[in-house]
């Protein structure tokens, strides 16, 4: 049996000094020999998805101690992508994922912790902690802070649901008065929690359920609802049990790499495609798979995207549907249940809470179980009161939405689309692939051709859109915004939002080697690989070149002959692969270090040390 890692610092005469320091943290004689569980929190007052986590780490810690473990809490950083959006702050968002993963590794290995409870929530925090968990491969349970309630505003004599993106779009739309913009702004983000749509944070927290590393309801139970407290309480007890099974019973089945296998990654990506999750999840799943030493690639994502239907459409794809509605329809277990019915999942694999996913679905899928407890759990409703306090309300819907024909979650037979919610496109513009969230693309523009309007940065693209330089039929092309070229692979939420503000959301396309917020919609194609800074063809496109986009056939093509491209490449090689215009962008040493090691988006934008 493997010895408890913590014995390195708690046992033996020579560890008297270490034990003395442990005693100074509150440990007693009887605590030495118990599993030491790291409570990996991410509380910060900068981020609404994390502002309520301050006391939740200690809630988990108390449950760990009542179950016979020793809990030690620390915090990671957390960047709010919405606040960092639209300025140089966004350069730090994706690199923060690596910093979070490293900081968890540093703390857990430096202090020889035996297991972890990861309390995450927003965009890069869940992926960073997931990467660390698979890197360390010690028992872990994920429990996130939960989704925000959707904003609501009385608009033209009816109640309209809102989120962050509505505020951004309205602010740039001259049809809205200042008073209307203020009304939307004040109502868009009413509570603590991760932004209310199927954006990156909620997408990733949902995927932890499919990976088997979190409890049912983790992705969809509102941050404000009292039911969410149970997830934190159970996580504290569960992690002690998992630690004992591994260290005292030699049960390797509880380890993250035994749970998050290749099949589990397939399940997670299948879920992502079915619910139209954020394109950022592609980056994060590819990165996490590499930490787990699993050969899960863009080719696998492409394969899955061709056979998985869209079973759930959530904001930004459908503005009236938010995470609170997904939970009301049975949450992630409800979507997984329909995917299982369609034969699209591997359910023989374990989870942290169940012997197999199949057994978990039999108990937690509201269309399969008569359990009063399960139906009550998924009836949790928004409270409708602005608050930053977790578990502060207990409102419920009268009954769960089990309509799989016209409800929020559909069966395969009644799918929103038989074609998946994410697609990988290939062609001479993206030889290693690029990603589009098809769930957010209007059917009228699934095939699109138009002239490229070239911008060497997100900033110049924003100015071009707001100044009326983009016309219907144009393709906005933003380059040198990839992992190396940015550096940091900025999100392009402002350009996509401003296209919508100008009435061009269904009349234009946007292509970039950067990435998109989970809040982006429209014909937005990102992660173009190789990126311009790596010598990708996107760096050879010139103003007015025609680009053909064919989502049904998964193709993207620059209509320029090979000989001309070869001439342009020779010219660019001589000039250097850098933006044609000077960018006023301060690149710190920290960002330069990330850029020096960053790999392509097709590899998850992870770091790679020089050979």
UniProtKB/Swiss-Prot annotation:
Similarity comment text for this entry: Belongs to the IlvD/Edd family.
Complex formation: Homodimer.
Active site: 517 (proton acceptor)
Keyword annotations of the record: 2Fe-2S, Amino-acid biosynthesis, Branched-chain amino acid biosynthesis, Iron, Iron-sulfur, Lyase, Magnesium, Metal-binding
GO BP terms in the entry: isoleucine biosynthetic process; L-valine biosynthetic process
Modified residues (N6-carboxylysine): 124
Keyword Lyase: yes
Manner of cofactor binding, per the entry note: Binds 1 [2Fe-2S] cluster per subunit. This cluster acts as a Lewis acid cofactor.
Residue sites binding [2Fe-2S] cluster per the record: 122, 195
This protein's record includes keyword Nucleotide-binding: no
Origin species: Brucella abortus (strain 2308)
Pfam families per record: ILV_EDD_C (PF24877), ILVD_EDD_N (PF00920)
Protein name, as recorded: Dihydroxy-acid dehydratase
GO cellular component, one term: cytosol
CC cofactor: [2Fe-2S] cluster; Mg(2+)
GO molecular function annotation: 2 iron, 2 sulfur cluster binding; dihydroxy-acid dehydratase activity; magnesium ion binding
Class of the enzyme per the UniProt entry, highest EC level: lyase
Documented EC number(s): 4.2.1.9
Catalytic activity: (2R)-2,3-dihydroxy-3-methylbutanoate = 3-methyl-2-oxobutanoate + H2O; (2R,3R)-2,3-dihydroxy-3-methylpentanoate = (S)-3-methyl-2-oxopentanoate + H2O
Pathway per the UniProt entry: Amino-acid biosynthesis; L-isoleucine biosynthesis; L-isoleucine from 2-oxobutanoate: step 3/4; Amino-acid biosynthesis; L-valine biosynthesis; L-valine from pyruvate: step 3/4
Role summary: Functions in the biosynthesis of branched-chain amino acids. Catalyzes the dehydration of (2R,3R)-2,3-dihydroxy-3-methylpentanoate (2,3-dihydroxy-3-methylvalerate) into 2-oxo-3-methylpentanoate (2-oxo-3-methylvalerate) and of (2R)-2,3-dihydroxy-3-methylbutanoate (2,3-dihydroxyisovalerate) into 2-oxo-3-methylbutanoate (2-oxoisovalerate), the penultimate precursor to L-isoleucine and L-valine, respectively.
Binding site for Mg(2+): 81, 123-124, 491
């Amino acid at each position: 049996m493997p010895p408890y890692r913590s014995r390195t610092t708690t046992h033996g005469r020579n560890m008297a000094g270490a034990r003395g320091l442990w005693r100074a943290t509150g440990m007693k004689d009887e605590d030495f020999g118990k599993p030491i569980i790291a409570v990996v929190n991410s509380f910060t007052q900068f981020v609404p998805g994390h502002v309520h986590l301050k006391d939740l780490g200690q809630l988990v810690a108390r449950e760990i101690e009542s179950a016979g473990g020793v809990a030690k809490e620390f915090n990671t950083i957390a960047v709010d992508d919405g606040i960092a959006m639209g300025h140089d702050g966004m350069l730090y968002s994706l690199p923060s994922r690596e910093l979070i993963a490293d900081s968890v590794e540093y703390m857990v290995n430096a202090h020889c912790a035996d297991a972890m409870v990861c309390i995450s929530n927003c965009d890069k925090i869940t992926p960073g902690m997931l990467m660390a968990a698979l890197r360390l491969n010690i028992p872990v349970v994920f429990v996130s802070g939960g989704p925000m309630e959707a904003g609501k505003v009385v608009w033209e004599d009816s109640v309209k649901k809102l989120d962050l993106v509505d505020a951004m779009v309205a602010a740039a739309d001259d049809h809205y008065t200042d008073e209307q913009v203020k009304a939307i702004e004040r109502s868009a983000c009413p509570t603590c929690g991760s932004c209310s749509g199927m954006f990156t944070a909620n997408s990733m927290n949902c995927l932890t359920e499919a990976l088997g590393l979190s409890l049912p309801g983790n992705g969809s139970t509102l941050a404000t609802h009292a039911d969410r407290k149970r997830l934190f309480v159970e996580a504290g007890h569960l992690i002690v049990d998992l630690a004992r099974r591994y260290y005292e019973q030699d049960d390797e089945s509880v380890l993250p790499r035994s749970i998050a296998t290749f099949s589990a990654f397939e399940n997670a990506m299948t879920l992502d495609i079915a619910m139209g999750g954020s394109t950022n999840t592609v980056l994060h799943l590819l990165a996490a798979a590499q930490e787990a030493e699993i050969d899960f690639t863009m080719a696998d994502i492409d394969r899955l995207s061709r056979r998985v239907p869209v079973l759930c459409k959530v904001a930004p794809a459908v503005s009236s549907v938010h995470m609170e509605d997904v939970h009301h329809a049975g949450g992630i277990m409800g979507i997984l249940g329909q995917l299982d019915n369609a034969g699209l999942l591997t359910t023989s694999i374990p989870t942290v809470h169940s012997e197999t996913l199949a057994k978990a679905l039999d108990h937690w899928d509201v269309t399969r179980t008569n359990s009063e407890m399960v139906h009550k759990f998924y009836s949790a409703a928004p409270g409708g009161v602005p608050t930053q306090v977790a578990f502060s309300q207990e409102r419920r819907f009268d009954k769960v939405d089990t309509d799989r024909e016209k409800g929020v979650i559909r069966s395969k037979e009644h799918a929103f689309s038989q074609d998946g919610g994410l697609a990988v496109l290939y062609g001479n513009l993206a030889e290693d692939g690029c990603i589009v969230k098809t769930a957010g693309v209007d059917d009228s523009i699934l095939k699109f051709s138009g002239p490229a309007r070239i911008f060497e940065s997100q900033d110049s693209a924003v100015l071009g859109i707001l100044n009326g330089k983009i016309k219907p039929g144009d393709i906005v092309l933003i380059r040198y915004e990839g992992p190396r070229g940015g550096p940091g692979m900025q999100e392009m939420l402002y350009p996509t939002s401003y296209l919508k503000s100008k009435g061009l959301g269904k009349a234009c396309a946007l292509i970039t080697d950067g990435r998109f917020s989970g809040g982006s919609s429209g014909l937005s194609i990102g992660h173009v690989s190789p990126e311009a800074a790596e010598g990708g063809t996107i760096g050879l496109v010139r103003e007015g070149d025609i680009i053909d986009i064919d989502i049904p056939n998964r193709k993207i093509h620059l209509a320029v002959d090979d000989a001309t491209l070869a001439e342009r490449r020779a010219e660019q090689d001589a000039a250097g692969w850098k933006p044609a215009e000077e960018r006023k962008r301060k690149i710190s040493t920290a960002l330069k270090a990330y850029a020096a090691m960053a790999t392509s988006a097709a590899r998850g934008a992870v770091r790679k040390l020089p050979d």
